[in-house]
């Protein structure tokens, strides 16, 4: 038998019907549902008189529209309707839901892993583009549209064209204060927002292996920003230890058996990818996006580029348009860009380790005058754990707002938005025009970089900032 990549192994194991050159019917192991992309899907089932095929393989939560202050008092009529509709649909169709009053409520891509629902070798879908987050566990996880949500609810299967395979090999060792977020931003800045189109990416190399599970989730979360169908990392001992004891993970001897099965998922020696790209981690510095797509980013020691630096006319126009929207001048040092807002949260960087990293840098310091800074845990479970460690007090004493969980300022679908023309250092995953509110200017950064910007009032090189004296 020819050597296979992990991508091919999972695909082949889940193919119900498949023919070379034609779409395959894939079996879906886990379907996660939220309030925004599911209402029409459930209504389609209702009109057709169909039940949910496998409610036991379906899990729901609400996150996009949830207020992070006074979360039970939802002022927006559409948001309130979507949340109420999800609750009613889950009750009618027998689906487990982590509602607003649940201790397990949170962002769908945070609670799936922490509850042990996400496991190696699974096919996982959700009506959300950042479903790729779950690929950090060695799962084939990708976002789907509302009509596909209905198809999975009805059949527990999905027609999909087989993707090409890609390896992104990250060699070397990260410098201190350089993070997983910087890796993925650097990869996208180097290769662009479409290099992954038509592919599923496997991230490999010693720099990837050295990351924690939460850091790996950050990497896979943003694989969609490279245009990829999904991104994943082969499971290893780090994966297994994270899953051990999780509520929905196998227990006892079953867990030992599962580990043997999960270990067999690793890409075979000699397996051939359709494309291979490389990145040296030791060359990566803390990253900041300056434009309106995730590829428009650079190291913190650099300057805002000029349209004259473009390699072709299309890129020149794109740079010019982005600079106009962002209100930036070519040649401006990144460290001279002032910010008015800081957001530490989202399905990219709202886990406990992200909050610990930010709190460590913030402790004993104060948020700069004129800066509004928010910390939004990715789940109620993360929030409780952070409060148990006293992280909330560190943030509040520094002048940050400490919130309940939710998608929050990542997108302008809830009360947490950035005013028009103002600038935000954000740990989220997208910096498109209007993403955080009409006219909002978003700079994507790591939690460390966001925390440092909150204190300084502008971007700073976190590598040297950490050594500066703290106030008492």
UniProtKB/Swiss-Prot annotation:
Pfam families: Aconitase. Its cofactor is [4Fe-4S] cluster. Residues 289-312 are annotated as: Disordered. Keywords: 4Fe-4S, Amino-acid biosynthesis, Branched-chain amino acid biosynthesis, Iron, Iron-sulfur, Leucine biosynthesis, Lyase, Metal-binding. [4Fe-4S] cluster binds at residues 347, 407, 410. Gene3D superfamilies: Aconitase, domain 3 (3.30.499.10). It catalyses: (2R,3S)-3-isopropylmalate = (2S)-2-isopropylmalate. InterPro entries: 3-IsopropMal_deHydase_lsu, Acnase/IPM_dHydase_lsu_aba_1/3, Acoase/IPM_deHydtase_lsu_aba, Aconitase_4Fe-4S_BS, Aconitase_4Fe-4S_dom, IPM_dehydratase_rel_enz, IPMI_cat. Binds 1 [4Fe-4S] cluster per subunit. One of its GO terms (biological process) is L-leucine biosynthetic process. Its EC number is 4.2.1.33. Pathway: Amino-acid biosynthesis; L-leucine biosynthesis; L-leucine from 3-methyl-2-oxobutanoate: step 2/4. The keyword Metal-binding applies. Residues 290-304 have a biased composition (Polar residues). One of its GO terms (molecular function) is 4 iron, 4 sulfur cluster binding. NCBIfam families: leuC, PRK05478.1, PRK12466.1. Catalyzes the isomerization between 2-isopropylmalate and 3-isopropylmalate, via the formation of 2-isopropylmaleate. Belongs to the aconitase/IPM isomerase family. LeuC type 1 subfamily. Heterodimer of LeuC and LeuD. This is 3-isopropylmalate dehydratase large subunit.
């Amino acid at each position: 038998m020819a050597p296979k990549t992990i991508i091919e192994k999972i695909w082949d194991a889940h193919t119900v019907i498949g023919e070379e050159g034609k779409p395959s019917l894939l079996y879906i192991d886990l379907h996660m549902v939220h309030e925004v992309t599911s209402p029409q899907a459930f209504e389609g089932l209702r009109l057709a008189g169909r039940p949910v095929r496998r409610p036991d393989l379906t899990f729901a939560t609400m996150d996009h529209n949830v207020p992070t202050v006074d979360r039970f008092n939802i002022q927006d009529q559409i948001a309130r309707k979507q949340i109420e509709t999800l609750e009613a649909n889950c009750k009618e169709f027998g689906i487990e839901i982590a509602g607003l009053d649940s201790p397990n409520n949170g962002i769908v891509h945070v609670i799936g892993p922490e509850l042990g629902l996400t496991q190696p070798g699974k096919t996982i879908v959700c009506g959300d583009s950042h479903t790729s987050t779950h690929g950090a566990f060695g799962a084939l996880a990708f976002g789907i549209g509302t009509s596909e949500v209905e198809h999975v609810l009805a059949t527990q299967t999905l027609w999909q064209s087989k993707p090409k395979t890609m390896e992104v090999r990250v060699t070397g060792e990260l410098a201190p204060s350089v993070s997983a977020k910087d890796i993925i931003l650097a990869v996208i800045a180097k290769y662009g927002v479409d290099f992954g189109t038509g592919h599923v990416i496997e991230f490999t190399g010693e720099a990837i292996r050295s990351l924690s599970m939460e850091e790996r989730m950050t990497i896979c979360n943003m694989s969609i920003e490279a245009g990829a169908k999904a991104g994943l990392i082969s499971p290893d001992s780090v994966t297994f230890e994270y899953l051990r004891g999780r509520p929905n993970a196998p227990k006892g001897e079953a867990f030992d058996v599962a580990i043997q099965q999960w270990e067999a998922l690793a890409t075979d020696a000699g397996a051939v990818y359709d494309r291979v790209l490389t990145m040296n981690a030791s060359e990566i510095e803390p990253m900041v996006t300056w434009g309106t797509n995730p590829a428009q980013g650079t190291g913190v020691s650099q300057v805002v580029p000029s349209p004259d630096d473009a390699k072709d006319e299309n890129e020149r126009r794109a740079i010019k348009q982005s600079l106009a929207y962002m209100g930036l001048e070519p040649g401006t040092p990144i460290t001279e860009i002032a910010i008015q807002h800081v957001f530490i949260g989202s399905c990219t960087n709202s886990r406990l380790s992200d909050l610990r990293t930010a709190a460590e840098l913030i402790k004993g310091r104060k948020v700069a005058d004129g800066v509004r800074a928010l910390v939004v845990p990715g789940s109620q479970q993360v929030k409780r754990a952070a409060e148990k460690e006293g992280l909330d007090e560190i943030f509040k004493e520094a002048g940050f707002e400490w919130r309940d969980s939710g998608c929050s300022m990542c997108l302008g679908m809830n009360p947490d938005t950035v005013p028009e023309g103002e600038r935000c250092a954000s740990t989220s995953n997208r910096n498109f025009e209007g993403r955080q509110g009409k006219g909002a200017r978003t700079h994507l950064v790591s939690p460390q970089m966001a925390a440092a910007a909150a204190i300084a009032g502008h971007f700073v090189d976190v590598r040297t900032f950490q050594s500066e004296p703290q106030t008492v």
